[in-house]
Amino acid sequence: MAISEQDVKRRIDSTKKTSQITTAMQMVSTAKLSQIQRHTVGYQVYAQKVESIVAHLAKSHLMSASVAGKAKSDQAISAADLLAQRPVKKTGYLIITSDRGLVGSYNSSVIKQTNDFMQKHGHTEGDAVILAVGGTGSDFYRNRNHEVAYEYRGVSDVPTFNEIREIVKTVTKMYTEEKFDELYVCYNHFVNRLSNSFRVTKLLPIGGDDLANNEAHEQVTAEYDTEPSPEALLQEILPQYAESLVYGAILDAKTAEHAASSSAMRSASDNASDLIADLELQYNRARQSAITTEITEITGGQAALE
């Protein structure tokens, strides 16, 4: 059944309105991406300095000495808790997704590859503890009857450092209470405006040996004088290091999210433009057919009158 000119015209108008919306959303996402990239550049300098100090302490064997002494603190996050290692019975996964859709394959990629990582390491529902930052990940696991031990929704478009302190405090407390024995952060790492890659980072326990042996810190010397004591220094720097890991992951994930949203909206706008072009061609053909029919009818009527 042929579509009438009016129906085609309505579809063209509707598609143009949709294209205006997706174009506006693309511009918003691009602006957010530029904003968070400027913010991230400054933060990376801080994060690298903190990691360098922790690596320095690891090479000085001060971190292992602190664990041996079990130096506790009255502060919310204890350095000894962050360093304490024990046999792994349960593994926690802090999964970072977005709160909404319209981000292409961003969320499905994180969830799928996190599940693949769990399967590869033999972690089942019984020994995998899910902690979700972002509503999409939380809803996914809940809809599949998987308990979500912790969720955090409403992360800002450009997250602040204070936002993640609640997350770090909560997951550290859960680790101290032995709700899980190790914790991984799973998220999409921003590569460029067109692509991202899945990344898994071990957050807890903080591995001093891993940092000390990291090739990136080979030039770090192992001579540190600490005041007032190694324990006091660790108590200050290790919570900051844990916060920097989580904050850095969330910043990275948010950057990838904005890039994915911008790319998805650009693709939607391009598809809308192609559809409009096809509909306009279809409309013009219908108009041409109608005009040809009218001319034929007029010519036929005139011939009948002669």
UniProtKB/Swiss-Prot annotation:
Protein's gene: atpG
GO cellular component assignments: plasma membrane; proton-transporting ATP synthase complex
Keyword Transport: yes
GO biological process entries: proton motive force-driven plasma membrane ATP synthesis
Complex and partners: F-type ATPases have 2 components, CF(1) - the catalytic core - and CF(0) - the membrane proton channel. CF(1) has five subunits: alpha(3), beta(3), gamma(1), delta(1), epsilon(1). CF(0) has three main subunits: a, b and c.
Alphabetized CDD domains for the sequence: F1-ATPase_gamma
Any one Gene Ontology molecular-function term assigned to this protein's record: ATP binding
Localization per record: Cell membrane
Entry's family note: Belongs to the ATPase gamma chain family.
Name listed for the protein in its UniProt record: ATP synthase gamma chain
Lineage: Bacteria, Bacillati, Bacillota, Bacilli, Lactobacillales
Main location: membrane
Source superkingdom: Bacteria
